[in-house]
UniProtKB/Swiss-Prot annotation:
Its main location: cytoplasm. It is an enzyme of class 3 (hydrolase). Binds 1 divalent metal cation per subunit. It is found in: Cytoplasm. This is 5'-nucleotidase SurE. It comes from Cupriavidus necator (strain ATCC 17699 / DSM 428 / KCTC 22496 / NCIMB 10442 / H16 / Stanier 337). It catalyses: a ribonucleoside 5'-phosphate + H2O = a ribonucleoside + phosphate. Belongs to the SurE nucleotidase family. One of its GO terms (cellular component) is cytoplasm.
Length: 250
């Protein structure tokens, strides 16, 4: 089993290190992650400048390779030129903070998994629901459990899976739930500040609260103490509007 690891918090992030340690006994692990934090980068590719790859020489990250680009850059480079042997699985994370509902459209963590899936590799994104890295050891155990299940019972086709893990001690996690994406309210307003030169700076506001956290959603499962596993697809076609659009065009 050859697993490619990536993330969006950067190669120095604790979530990547513990994920690497948890999965190392399962096979060959290749780490290619961003040099810097790229949270919220979504599926962006770097097209206006060349990219470079470096290797960490010390610490728990020794042997990790990192790219001066985005999470999608990392997986794209790995699968389209850097790795002679394609991995069997792409794993992204563990992210600091949830990726539920519409978060998946913005998340660099999910985007790294999406790139693996687009290039024909089964892919999984792991996120902790709350920030702060509390109970990261439990999240790593959950990630290993999921990957072991994938190895033991591989799906028939490439898949894209989004996993959100409650920040709880492992023994307090109630189990696993197959879920759909919930929905959020619109993001909160931008935050404005005036710098010493009198210019107005803008900070993107916090994500909106959940507005659909009903039973069966990722929000509901995580809030109840369960690990949420959501299968994702990339076809954004609104099929229910095709006939109406066709009539509108006539």
């Amino acid at each position: 089993m050859h697993i490619l690891l990536a993330n969006d918090d950067g190669y120095l992030a604790p979530g990547l290190a513990v994920l690497h340690a948890a999965l190392a006994p399962l096979g060959r692990i290749t780490v290619i992650a961003p040099e810097q934090n790229h949270s919220g980068a979504s599926n962006s590719l770097t097209l206006q400048r060349p990219l470079s790859i470096y290797e960490a020489r010390e610490g728990v990250q020794k042997g990790f390779r990192f790219v001066n680009g985005t999470p999608t850059d990392c997986v794209h480079i790995a699968l389209t030129g850097l790795l002679e042997e394609k991995p069997d699985l792409v794993v992204s994370g563990i992210n600091q903070g949830q990726n539920m509902g519409e978060d998946v459209l913005y998340s660099g963590t999910v985007a790294a998994a999406i790139e693996g899936y687009l290039l024909g590799i089964p892919s999984v994104a792991f996120s902790q629901v709350d920030k702060g890295w509390e109970h990261l050891d439990a999240a790593a155990r959950v990630a290993r459990t999921v990957v072991e299940r994938i190895i033991g019972t591989p799906p028939a086709e490439p898949f894209l899976l989004n996993v959100n893990i409650p920040n709880l001690p492992f023994e307090h996690i109630k189990g696993y739930r197959a879920t759909r994406l919930g929905k959020r309210h619109p993001s909160q307003p931008v935050i404005t500040q005036v710098n010493p030169r009198g210019d107005t700076n803008y900070w993107i506001g916090p994500a909106g609260d959940a507005r659909d956290a009903s039973e069966g959603t990722d929000f509901h499962a995580a809030a109840a103490g369960y690990v949420s596993l959501t299968p994702l697809q990339l076809d954004l076609t609104h099929r229910g509007q095709l006939d109406a659009l066709d009539q509108w065009l006539k």
